[in-house]
Curated annotation (Swiss-Prot):
Coiled coil: none annotated. GO terms for cellular component: chloroplast; membrane. Residues 264-283, 312-333, 1263-1282 are annotated as: Disordered. This is Putative protein TIC 214 C-terminal part. Its main location: plastid. The keyword Plastid applies. Pfam families: Ycf1 (PF05758).
Amino acid sequence: MKPEEIRVNGKEIFKDEEEEDKDLFWFEKPLVTLLFDYKRWNRPLRYIKNDRFENAVSNKMSQYFFHTCPSDGKKIISFTYPPSLSTIEEIIQKRMSLYTTEKGSPEDLYNNWVYTNKKKKNNLSNELINRIEAIEKGSVSIDVLEKRIRLCHDENEQKCLPKWYDPFFNGPYRGTITKVDSQNEDEHFGEMTWKKKIYDIPHKLKNSQEFEEKRNTFHFNRKLLSTDSNNLFTPIGEFDEELASSFYLKEIFLDSEKKSLYSENQKKNGKQPVDTIKNNSNDQALRKHEIEIEKMNKKLPRWSYKLIDDLEQQEEENPEESTGNPGIRSRKAKRVVIYTDKDQNIHTDTSTDSDQAEEIALIRYSQQSDFRRDLIKGSMRSQRRKTLILEMFQANAHPPLFLDRLNKTSFSFNFSKMSMGKELEFKTANSENAEKREAVIKEKTDKSDRLAIAETWDSVTFAQPIRGCILVAQSIVRKYIILPTLIIGKNLGRILFWQSPEWDEDFHEWKKEMHIKCTYNGVQLSETEFPKAWLTDGIQIKILFPFSLKPWHRSKQTSLQVDPIKVKKQNFCFLTVWGRETEQPFGPPRKNPPFFKPILKELKKEMINRFFRVPKTLKNGTKGFMKVEKEKTTLIIQIVFFLKRKMKEFLFVFVKVNPTPLVRSQKIYESNENEKNSILSNKITYESNIQKKSTIDLKNLSLTEKKIKDLSDHTSIIRNQIERVAKDKKRIYLISDRNPSTGETGWYDKDKGRESKKGIWQIFKKRSTRLIRKWPYFLKSLIQKIYTETLLFTISSTDDYAKFFIESTKKSLNKHIYNDEKDKRVIDEINQNTIEFISTINRSFSNITNIFNNSNKNSLTYFELFSLSQAYVFLKLSQTQVFNLYCLGSLLQYHGASTLFKKKIKDYLGSQGIFNFKLKQKKLQNSGINDWKNWLRSHYQYNLPKIRWSRIVPQKWRNRINERRTIKKKGSIFSHSYAKENDQFIYYKKQKNFRMNSLTNQKEKLKKHYRYDLSSYKYLHYEELKNSPLISRSPFQIKGGQEIPYNYNNYNRPKYESFFYVPEIIAINDYLIMGEYVFNTDKNRDRKYLDWGILNLGFKKNINIEYWTHMDTRPFSQDTRTRSNDYRVVENKNLFFLRIHQEINPSNQKNTLFDWMGMNEEMLYYSISSIEPWFFPEFVPRYDIYKIKPCIIPIKSLFLNFYGKESISKNINVNRKANHDTSSNFKKYPVFKNINQEEKEGQGQEVLRSNAQNQQKSFIEKDYKESDIQKPRTKAQSKNNKETELDSFLKKYLLFQLRWNNSLNQKVIDNIKVYSLLLRLKNPREIAISSIQRGEMRLDVMLFQKDITLSGLIKGGLLVIEPIRLYLKWDFQFFMYQIVGISLVHKDKQQIKTRCRIKEYVDKMDFDGSFLPYGKTLVKGHEKHYDLLVPEHILSPRRRRELRILMSFNSGKENIMGRGPFILNGKSVRNCEPFFYEDKYLDTDANKFIQFKFFLWPNYRLEELACMNRYWFDSNNGSRFSMLRIRMYPRHRIL
């Protein structure tokens, strides 16, 4: 291999020499080299590195070094002088010290410098004059123009290199572009093989030992060798030995049997593969010759160090080939190995290293903001402006001006409809209640706290080793000391309290606890395996099934009743430095289940039971007392029955002695028989029958037998009566409620009262017992009833309060609206502020509507009046014809006054500065004198379209406004009544109040302040820029008779076509129709990359935008049949196709110069950005494409559009006869070869484009193939399709970072943590099931979709690419379009009423015949004033720039704007200064606009990069160029 060349301080050294320097000892090196490294980088602050190069390019253009240097003819001190140039100058002065040199005076130096510049300027001016004179003499214009050379790589000169690879355009390219003919590829390869092998012979001979041995034995005559005609040893004649024929030439002719070295023709002709090779012992000539043969390259100064960052060093496959310590500071990250595959049986590839195990690692990035930005270690950091960081850990710094991209509203209010006209339902965007929101907020705060603690441990020196050792010690102490001690103490305590110990249960749970070693991020490894470099990277210890000491173990039945959520939370934890447990790493310590709490709880219950034992005894005593009383009651009853029986016996004896009273009593008893119950009557009758029977038997029996029989009969009767009374006791009590009458009392009345008292006591006793038994249930139901009633009352009262609040709010709103309606009748003419001014204009509109329409059917739609600027009011005034206010619309469309307005309204509008006219005034006042008005009109921030103000209001109201935006004719079905409008306004006022009362957004405030500061700064310098074409127009004036088709989107047009329709007077950012391709140029706009007029929308097909801006600008009464063909011709064209402009007749077409803002480029890539959706999310991909690949504007000849009409596509009908002469003239010049071929081949340009794209791809592939950065791989690896696809995505960025979606990222990381543990376990079943139950391992993430692609992941939002885009270096075309961009948009394309139309400015062959004073000829044709012939364009851009620079040296001494008239072709034309003050409506008058543009081109050019001294800013990224005041060069004078 040839040694690598490295250029250091102007010297060329090789890698071999560098290695020799490294072999030197430290004492052998000079003292200066030890103290100061002369190869070390100074500045730039960036390490310019690319994958295509091994070492980075040394950029020494921006460094502080003070030295004197000549500038503008004088010697000044430069603080950025190149140090190498200073060193060379000192060396030259030392060599020339022997000679005496005379130093000239400073005046002579300055005079020489001025003389040289004048001479150069005169030469350029004379050359320009000569070219112009040649044109006047009738020379061919294409020969007069100065041409630029393009490098072509095709014989037909049809295919040129792209601009970036063309050395004539972009300078020498660092890469190589080679193209080998396929026919001669084999011969070329064989020849190169020959040459390489022969080149290697001297190098091999030099270091060969065999050569040294044979050198002493073999000698032969050199002359004989030199006379041999077939001598092949001429290249090694220096060594005059014979060894080449016997030793090294064998290696050359190894494959001579398969293929001859050269053909027979070559042998006959005596040709040799190599003609001559000069002898050089240092191989320098051989190497140079080899470089000339293989390729052409340019040696660039490179750093001798091959710097790498930390991640590159960690990802090196071969640590032995490491280049040393990393020298570039990358984002703080660590490589964490999560799995090491040590199973060697799996590998079947013999090329793999069996000793090296395969590792799977993750990159752990720090959560801090990355402000290192690839800085070189030891270099100075750049001083930049302060950046605001809103979040605690923010990846990239965002300027506050662009914070609208990051707006994320977490909470919003919405009003819903009133139910029954009284109730309002408040709905929030998130349906979570207050508790859930608090939980989410707490979770976020905990996460931020954990991140802060983790970063603190990372930032402190030697913190990770200390923490790791403490964690390991805490794990050992906990597992083997603390927990066993607690178990022993617990069981001894149980033994002392006469309880059974629980040794087995406790030690079983202790053995179940596992201490898993984890990485710093929490990735689980195993119990015994420590993470790699855990002392420096950090470690976590995760405890699975943590042991918690319990006072006793419950049975299995009671353990099943435990809440599963609590068990789930206790399954794992992390160990802290203090030996405590936490849920998450670096989280707060959690509370362990207390040991003594259950014991104290049981003791409390026991104490409560002892304290309440007395009430229990009383309760038991009461029960015993009641039982005794019951027994006593039954005894008394028995005694009473016994006494009754004795009394009956006594009565029986008494009746037997005195029978008469018995009969009397019987009669009395029988007399009352009808009044007794049936039971008593039966009983008495039964007794009487027995007595009768007994009196009969007394006669036959003796007295003793009679007595015995009577007693037994009486006993049986009493027994039966007792039983009957016991059964029918309740019934007897109910019947005996009747009070006996006087004289009817008997013996049974007393018994009846006694029985009733006894029943009442029994009832009371039973009910009291029932009450005691059911008292707890009764108390519980009572409490529930009270609680329910209280809750219902509270809810109803809250509802009443809400109704009262809503009613009061409604009344206040109605009162406020009533006051507004009342205030509309009065106009305050003395004190008017901005809000009153806007409301007064609104009232004036409604008054005008009432005057001319006499109805409220077409009343104005109310909108947010307090958030609109004056510029918006101006715009609405100019568009009032949409609301059928024709009188006001006509006033604004042409110069003149209206007699239909009242004097009061006119005077008021004039007093506010909008219109200053009187009743008899015929012309509007020139608005150019009001600087602030022009300033507002010239900036898009204050030129609000309808889309901007509609964003202020909520979505529902905006939808209604958009639907009702188009107002139909009077009496249309779409018109709405005034009452409905009033209701909508009330509804919106309520929404507005709630929106204003919500929390203000911090980002919005910051963005507003920054925008105000920027606008104020620009307005302060407005006087210096007031002559700029940005403010040279008024958006109020429209030619009379021209309609503004404001509702043009309602016509049947394609969406992409309706977007590009621009009315005559409204700017393109004023007229954004809500369609498919609508975007907002104010809200989301990046001023570093994006200009308001240059937007690459990324269409999938070519769309001629400028062409559509001219369509349908004629009145709608014209023939519209040709509109369907307006866009057919555009789809088949490529980036470089010539522009087509549709006329009334499609065959009449002509080409113009400008590719309007470069938007006809085909979209090559789809959107892959993660920027949040804008107001119109359809245009996010277009914005991304612009930033990925900015506008490419092709360079064309400036006079290409002057050569007539061309036929671009076969779809257009062209009149061949009329253009026969023109097409024949085209063939004479090589510029138009492609145009003629395009007529023959319809798809030719498509082939060109595909070839250009393939060439660029081949260039990139070639560069990557030739890169030396690819290292040899030790394993047989190959990229799969996904890696290739990912590489193709990332090639478009220089810096980028990939990340998953947040939700998916957390799931994947959790699964990876579990996988890494399961792979190390022998029996992972239990851990896997536990992980699934805890939710750590998700089964849905484990499912892998086979057909998924990278683009699908990106579109689905799972994979996000966050590019860090660099600045763009604008070329000449960019500045040119900046100047003409607004004139292209605002050009007046009104209908010319006359039959005379404007033709092309320049004829085909004759300039003088067609160039009139204003550069146009009146012929039939449409008006197309895009470009004029400027004499300066004859020169090339480089010579043109040189001429302007030379002319600007003395421009400060002359009054440029006050010069005399400009002479061209004997015609006098006024200077351009009067145009700024005479009339501001240049784009409404074609003649004036052409004059103005004619002077705009040569007079005002933006200062280009060649004119700027880049040392002023000491920066490479152009961030400070925004503070530069652009200098405008004056025009040159042609005498």
